[in-house]
Amino acid sequence: MLKIENTEVLGWAHAIHGMRNPMNSWANSDSSWRYVAPAQREGHILASYSDDSEFWIGPNDANLMNRLRNAGTDHRKFMRMIVVYLDITAPLYWWKEFDTYKVGTVANSSSTMHKIAAKEFTLEDFSCEHLFGSANGEDTDCWISSTEGISEIEPIDILGLTITMLNKARELYLDYQEKAFTGNQFAKDHVKEYWWQMIQLLPSSYNQRRTVMLNYEVLANIYKSRRNHKLDEWHTFCDWIEGLPYSELITGPSLKDIPLSLIHI
């Protein structure tokens, strides 16, 4: 499971202005914050809006953006200046892969270290849509039988048992924490043991929320390498990329499929 909220794309005007600095071609720019009537929108691209204003990329700037984009990363520095903010809720196993993209990204996350005991654990806190279990409507053979041969345990049951254990550790942690605040020395000495139970039992399917900042160049690298990934979360992320303003800059054909040509500004 991956959920994206509060997307905001900024920096178009500055990126376009900087894109034209090398050849001092600012006079050729035809993008601006303004309202464009429907009859006049042909060739223009709506990139951003704020209150009653809209930022439209004109055909001159769009053409230059495409040519610079196709000329390679040395020429398309403007893509690093188009900044994207978003909130992502995703499982820890996906965040481990996202964290390989260190350059050009910043993230503030909900802290499992500080806030792991802030609320009771529930099944909705985990990405478990692929786990077998009759409760999920899956008619599967049991994976494990109990030693008595009476009950059957499905993968979803293992997660349920883990959640029960996490909540028991949370209950004891909060109890010992309260006693420690009142000066109980035994509680002070042992409260962290129950915190460790939660930290080390927490499955990688646990969903974490982060506020992320990245840019169009980073998204181009992600899209190229992850759009056919086996994780559903990457498919959701790449679908979101395709819905961004002027996403052709990100999702366009591979540079190796485009013949290099002289860039005219």
Predicted regions: what is each one?
Residues 1-263:
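Family-specific signature for flavin-dependent thymidylate synthase
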